[in-house]
Amino acid sequence: MAQVEKRGGLLRKSSASKKPLKEKVVLMYDEIFMTEDPSKCSPRFWEELFLMKVNLEYLEGKLESLDGEELMKIKDNINCLFQHCIQALGEEHPIRVVNALQTLCALIRGVHQKNKSTSGFDIINMLMGFDKAELCMKNLMESLDSLLCAEGSESLKSLCLKLLLCLVTVTDNISQNTILEYVMINSIFEAILQILSHPPSRREHGYDAVVLLALLVNYRKYESVNPYIVKLSIVDDEATLNGMGLVIAQALSEYNRQYKDKEEEHQSGFFSALTNMVGSMFIADAHEKISVQTNEAILLALYEAVHLNRNFITVLAQSHPEMGLVTTPVSPAPTTPVTPLGTTPPSSDVISSVELPLDADVQTSNLLITFLKYSSIVMQDTKDEHRLHSGKLCLIILTCIAEDQYANAFLHDDNMNFRVNLHRMPMRHRKKAADKNLPCRPLVCAVLDLMVEFIVTHMMKEFPMDLYIRCIQVVHKLLCYQKKCRVRLHYTWRELWSALINLLKFLMSNETVLLAKHNIFTLALMIVNLFNMFITYGDTFLPTPSSYDELYYEIIRMHQSFDNLYSMVLRLSTNAGQWKEAASKVTHALVNIRAIINHFNPKIESYAAVNHISQLSEEQVLEVVRANYDTLTLKLQDGLDQYERYSEQHKEAAFFKELVRSISTNVRRNLAFHTLSQEVLLKEFSTIS
């Protein structure tokens, strides 16, 4: 026995002195990296190569290790490998196809990685050769299209989408990725739509398909005609649009669920008990610890669908059971891909068909509700750059929705009432609202709640001016619709008025600090004009005459804030400083608010003196207001119900370029080609002839 151990030891010692044996595929890669054509000595070289398990790390690493000159010496072999990969995609043997797809991924990534450090290095020439590029890419795109549309292997479809995502995201700025010109010419748009319109393929590949489409839409969108934009804008197939909506809703629901789970876990833990003991002193820190990474890729897809396709607006209101409440048996899938920005798409559709009988006991939801909940989480904390971008994109999407006539129709529909549990930022001075006490209301109430919540919770040193302006614009556009269509919305308008006045107070108390960074008068003017909208047209859209009385009560009650604002803008408009013009606009806009204050205040004081009351109740003030409307004179202000429509190209191009760059980087970082193990593939393709 001791002798056997000794022999074993000797064997180990001798083997340690030798170099580890290279696997055959690595030896074959080494032959490709020689200047000679590897098929000269081995006529079956390319045929054998695609039967070997791909070694992605070695192939990519080898490409990265060569300098530009060395790489150019083996260009013919690289071109040959690329062309044989494309040929292999047409093979009957699935293993060859899988290996060809993975090899293409490694080639594209490896050559692009090399390009970052080599100036004047042309990727198309290096991969395919200029003379063959057009035909190569045509054949590649046709093969991918066929594989995606075929009824074959789901694993192959998954790899095809990953190859396309790899192709699109190899450069941070996708508009500089010249290979995408061929993806524009040889469109795979219909293949993407087919995936989204069929429930089985949507369950497996919907997420990757939607992200891919969102990225392709953003290729040189401002410089040239992008066929994916044109085609997306005219899609009217209900199954396809609903499929896209479901994929987006599931990804956002998954985010909402993850956040809720972390929140509950956090609240039930030791830290929660500690914060309760010390009066929630550390509530901000506690909140930061339960943040979940945002999913900007899926949000971009939602934006493009809402912005480009008017038919998609109907999908926002498509009712279905709330995804978090419905459980469905999940069949084991061969892969669980890690998706960009840390969100894994649900492995099964909550809804298997467009039409679904609804259980009266199950809370119904829709894509818009899911999006509003997502927005309420993301918009809580805008200090982080990703959340700031996500918060901005949420407000841009809401802007597009608030401008759409059909969207407004269902937002304000009294027959479409929902209970929407928005997340509210933990704040020391208010109690957590009980979700069960929320009433069922038209969806516009939830949008307004979200805007009020944002206004109240972001008055801070690092003031998000851009987000505030967008928030007020959303409110204004909704009011314009209500005025135009005479919609009398039963909403707690007082909460909005109070939030707006508190925002004005914040702007005034932080005048010096804020003016160093922002033109606060733009925002102040918008707030004042919202009040002017209520004053001038409130009788056409406020729910009751008493609501209009309450508006006047709030203005009179908070008259000191409006007086202080007037003093501030008057001071700056009479000085010859940079804010003169901006401040004077606010001065003029305050004319009716000041008229109300100056008209009613003396009458209230007189009423108090006559009746020997030191402090009037709300009802007594309202009594004075109602008795003195007739003698109030107001000026008619033009343009209060007009607004500039949203335009991406002129104002938002820089934001979207940066956002797409960030998404591209994250998609590339999270692409997982190893989710398909060779064992799984061999099991799936066990019938290789």
From Swiss-Prot:
Localization per Swiss-Prot or TrEMBL = Golgi apparatus membrane; Cytoplasm
* Pfam families on file: ARMH3_C (PF08427)
Keyword Plastid, does the record have it? no
Its primary localisation, in coarse terms, equals: Golgi
Q: Which residue windows are transmembrane per the record?
A: 520-538
Specify the superkingdom.
Answer: Eukaryota
Please give, as recorded in its UniProt entry, the membrane topology of this protein.
Single-pass membrane protein
Q: Which SMART domains match?
A: DUF1741
The family assignment reads:
Belongs to the ARMH3 family.
User: Per its record, how is this protein called by name?
Assistant: Armadillo-like helical domain-containing protein 3
Q: Which organism is it from?
A: Homo sapiens
